[in-house]
Amino acid sequence: MADVPNDAPEHCPGTSSDQAGKSSACQGCPNQSICASGATKAPDPAIEEIKQKMTSVKHKILVLSGKGGVGKSTFSAHLSHALASDSSKEVALLDVDICGPSIPKIMGLEGEQVHQSGSGWSPVYVEDNLAVMSIGFLLSSPDDAVIWRGPKKNGMIKQFLRDVDWGEVDYLIVDTPPGTSDEHLSIVQYLSGAGIDGAVIITTPQEVSLQDVRKEIRFCKKVNLPILGVIENMSGFVCPKCKNTSQIFPPTTGGAQRMCEELNLPLLGRIPLDPRIGKSCDEGKSFLTEVPDSPAAAAYQSIVQKIRDYCASHSASDDSC
């Protein structure tokens, strides 16, 4: 990963680049000599520290999306709620959407703060077995903007993984920003030694969303990140009275199903639109317990069971996880 120091010139190639310290853009940079020496290309010691920290976490799942507004954070939150509904399981939700942290609002934790202990930062708990960490807990107001360059974001993600006292955890769900950015590279790099079970990719039925999801899939393949499957969110609207389904966002090119068939990926399921999901998120409640008999809740539960089954088989075939 090519990190760019805060005091670097505009066209800095990055400290991990082959051109580090050698590019014309490096002339006059205070970091030129150390970059040219190759010292910056040494493995980040934090990777080994995080690997040791993550030995207490059984399963690590990233939630990705090609673009914003497709329900990625909503899914991350409800996946966490669903997994934590089994009181024998310990679940943690990590929000690495540094510039757009919505998890505190969705989980009903706005105004909560992180506390320091001898073991590190203590996450905020929704339930006894559901812990949450987000940069939103470090802001004085939810309206505060986080205006950070890549290196500072990377440093915060490193701190979340290394310094948070998660304890013994069965599932760590990582809610990422939309697209492919520094945050994605950082989380994959820092967890590379600890082992990631895989990524769940969220899309909506329209081609404009699927187009960006294909980029996300290529990213996963380039960084050797396994893909658990794709979820089509906002997939039709089921009328609560007549039970007929209307396509609010028509799958003009076949939707996620055709894309998954073409790319040989599992389609984990389709979640229909339900205005009550948005209402539950605004109120910081779990839609799965608020409206458990709805078609959307049934779709969620089916998808969550597939993720449970994947993780169970993954543990059986790979003792490192």
UniProtKB/Swiss-Prot annotation:
Q: Which residues bind [4Fe-4S] cluster 2?
A: C239, C242
Name any GO cellular component annotation: cytosol
Record's compositionally biased regions (Polar residues): 14-23
Q: InterPro entries, from UniProt?
A: Mrp-like_CS (IPR000808), Mrp/NBP35_ATP-bd (IPR019591), NUBP1/Nbp35 (IPR028601), P-loop_NTPase (IPR027417), YlxH/NBP35 (IPR033756)
UniProt KW Hydrolase keyword:
no
- GO BP, sorted A to Z: iron-sulfur cluster assembly
CC cofactor note: Binds 4 [4Fe-4S] clusters per heterotetramer. Contains two stable clusters in the N-termini of nubp1 and two labile, bridging clusters between subunits of the nubp1-nubp2 heterotetramer.
Q: Where in the cell is it found?
A: Cytoplasm
Q: Which GO terms describe its molecular function?
A: 4 iron, 4 sulfur cluster binding; ATP binding; ATP-dependent FeS chaperone activity; iron-sulfur cluster binding; metal ion binding
Q: Where does this protein hold [4Fe-4S] cluster 1?
A: C12, C26, C29, C35
Q: Where is this region: Disordered?
A: 1-23
Please give the subunit comment from the record.
Answer: Heterotetramer of 2 nubp1 and 2 nubp2 chains.
What does the UniProt function comment say about this protein? Component of the cytosolic iron-sulfur (Fe/S) protein assembly (CIA) machinery. Required for maturation of extramitochondrial Fe-S proteins. The nubp1-nubp2 heterotetramer forms a Fe-S scaffold complex, mediating the de novo assembly of an Fe-S cluster and its transfer to target apoproteins.
Q: Which family does it belong to?
A: Belongs to the Mrp/NBP35 ATP-binding proteins family. NUBP1/NBP35 subfamily.
Q: What's this protein's name?
A: Cytosolic Fe-S cluster assembly factor nubp1
